[in-house]
Amino acid sequence: MEDFVRQCFNPMIVELAEKAMKEYGEDLKIETNKFAAICTHLEVCFMYSDFHFINEQGESIVVELDDPNALLKHRFEIIEGRDRTMAWTVVNSICNTTGAEKPKFLPDLYDYKENRFIEIGVTRREVHIYYLEKANKIKSENTHIHIFSFTGEEMATKADYTLDEESRARIKTRLFTIRQEMANRGLWDSFRQSERGEETIEERFEITGTMRRLADQSLPPNFSCLENFRAYVDGFEPNGCIEGKLSQMSKEVNARIEPFLKTTPRPIRLPDGPPCFQRSKFLLMDALKLSIEDPSHEGEGIPLYDAIKCMRTFFGWKEPYIVKPHEKGINPNYLLSWKQVLAELQDIENEEKIPRTKNMKKTSQLKWALGENMAPEKVDFDNCRDISDLKQYDSDEPELRSLSSWIQNEFNKACELTDSIWIELDEIGEDVAPIEYIASMRRNYFTAEVSHCRATEYIMKGVYINTALLNASCAAMDDFQLIPMISKCRTKEGRRKTNLYGFIIKGRSHLRNDTDVVNFVSMEFSLTDPRLEPHKWEKYCVLEIGDMLIRSAIGQMSRPMFLYVRTNGTSKIKMKWGMEMRRCLLQSLQQIESMIEAESSVKEKDMTKDFFENKSETWPIGESPKGVEEGSIGKVCRTLLAKSVFNSLYASPQLEGFSAESRKLLLVVQALRDNLEPGTFDLGGLYEAIEECLINDPWVLLNASWFNSFLTHALR
């Protein structure tokens, strides 16, 4: 059949049919009858239009190709054969210029003389059956239907055949010739039997039994059964008077649909106020590690043993003092807490055998820092019923904060490469099926791009800290346990490395519910001077605890070493998600995979290798005030990973709300870019919903700023 089609039809028609099948994901090597049907339909549409013009008096005339008057206006606009986006653009343009009602489905032609869209049908069955199917699907009196069959029959709306008899006879003769040619090659019977009707999903699937009863019970008010609701939905014109439809649905709804134009959207308003502060559970770009390479000490792998070994690598300890106090805290208590950690670690080293875990003495400074006995007493509600002025205590509205540059710097740093390898994916057996081979290849390429990434370090650090804290919270509920903040990696040469970032001391942790809070004090090493960006460190008390020799291009230099101390809290559910931060790798890999799939479907072959090995190609990474930023595929992988990791590190209700609400605006803007002529109602309400999520969260504020950059460049 494929050979017949290529011989029988004009190469341009064959090419258009191939494109159409590719657009719908159909294989012309398998669906050969469909290939023939599409070519036939295209040819009939072109023949319908051929030689028909409108003269200066507005009359329809037939003019042969070589006629010198062929510069007359074409009577028919051909819509069939264009890709969907262009076809809808043509339809929208016709509707705008002629005032014609926009059809629900893409028609085949537009008749400028009769001012109507035309749906052409070519059937191998009875013309009246096919006509009814078309009419039932289109459900519009404004689209004219004209059906031709291979037997010479035809049927049209109100028996109005549009064209003169000679033009229609030419089409019928061509269809009869195609049928004869197919029959001569033994292809006709298969072609005739392969035609499917204009079915809809509802006609194919009957809902019966329990599902039917559930459907009848689940209807909106005022509908007695599924049929009534279906009839209402089928008659609901999406491009009709939406305002009227909304008022039908509810008396409270009163909406005016406004066209959404390039000039309609305004930037999202970011809050004013003091700069936002760092609120992650551990330091990110400012963290400093004390490391040991190729650890082989006694008890290697036991966190406390590893921590003591890492602490011994540093010789620049000095008497600690406060360099940046916490505005609201009792700062001497933070200083005393660090001194207590040093003293108790020294005590451990003096013991014959180092214990596996260390519970801190419950000193006054730790009790204060961990909020011991600070929780208000819980009283049974029944005992309070008689108190006349019983009310919930007033809570202050959170203070609005403005966007600060440090969060963009944090994100940029998270996308960078480090000199260590942070993940090694386990071997998962031989690839058997081709899909497994492709999946492994993609995973390996992706891993190579992100294994050195700083965002991957944050994942492993987050997994370790949350796992250790949850374990300690369950195993030592009443103890102030000392938990080293550790990560493990490999150097570029493949040597194992253990890193210590600092310590956590956890408070009492009787966690019954998922949201019950465990308090902890974090103490983290850093070389960042807090006085450079004091607003970032609002929640911290920062001590100077030593001097570190740093090797640089100009030789060794001494830098002060700081300890960032703060009180913090988390819950079982937050720790559970923190332990699963490796999911971020999967999410970003899936995003990359969808890019590869899109490219592969266009090129009709797996593009994984080309994608990762074509170093000259650049891809869009994101928006900045300068415009669309582009980079290598590796940069795209690392940026997507960093976004996913930051969504985890800075998870909050503000982020949930902003993501959900801004997505609605994003979809409308994308519809505008795709020339789909979107309309909106209560756009002000949508902006309000977006902006009420912009309070004080640094990551949400940065995302809002990125969104504004996107709006600026998307609507140019």
From Swiss-Prot:
Instruction: Give the UniProt keywords, A-Z.
Output: Cap snatching, Endonuclease, Eukaryotic host gene expression shutoff by virus, Eukaryotic host transcription shutoff by virus, Host cytoplasm, Host gene expression shutoff by virus, Host nucleus, Host-virus interaction, Hydrolase, Inhibition of host RNA polymerase II by virus, Manganese, Metal-binding, Nuclease, Phosphoprotein
| A matching Pfam family | Flu_PA
Query: How is the cofactor bound here?
Result: Binds 2 manganese ions per subunit.
* Positions with a binding annotation for Mn(2+) 1: 41, 108, 119-120
Motif Nuclear localization signal 2 (NLS2) covers 184-247
Top-level EC class as recorded in UniProt: hydrolase
EC number(s) reported in the record: 3.1.-.-
Please report any disulfide bonds recorded for this protein chain, giving both cysteine positions: none
Q: Where along this sequence does the record place binding of Mn(2+) 2?
A: 80, 108
Q: Supply one GO CC term from the record.
A: host cell nucleus
Obligatory cofactor(s): Mn(2+)
What are the recorded GO MF terms, alphabetically? Answer: endonuclease activity; metal ion binding; RNA binding
The biological process GO terms on file are: cap snatching; DNA-templated transcription; symbiont-mediated suppression of host gene expression; symbiont-mediated suppression of host mRNA transcription via inhibition of RNA polymerase II activity; viral RNA genome replication; viral translational frameshifting
Q: What Gene3D superfamilies does this protein map onto?
A: Influenza RNA-dependent RNA polymerase subunit PA, endonuclease domain
Residue window of motif Nuclear localization signal 1 (NLS1) = 124-139
List locations, semicolon-separated: Host cytoplasm; Host nucleus
PTM comment, free text: Phosphorylated on serines and threonines by host kinases, including human casein kinase II.
* Cited function: Plays an essential role in viral RNA transcription and replication by forming the heterotrimeric polymerase complex together with PB1 and PB2 subunits. The complex transcribes viral mRNAs by using a unique mechanism called cap-snatching. It consists in the hijacking and cleavage of host capped pre-mRNAs. These short capped RNAs are then used as primers for viral mRNAs. The PB2 subunit is responsible for the binding of the 5' cap of cellular pre-mRNAs which are subsequently cleaved after 10-13 nucleotides by the PA subunit that carries the endonuclease activity.
Q: How does it assemble?
A: Influenza RNA polymerase is composed of three subunits: PB1, PB2 and PA. Interacts (via C-terminus) with PB1 (via N-terminus).
Instruction: Report the family membership.
Output: Belongs to the influenza viruses PA family.
Which protein is depicted? Polymerase acidic protein
Q: Which organism is it from?
A: Influenza A virus (strain A/Memphis/1/1971 H3N2)
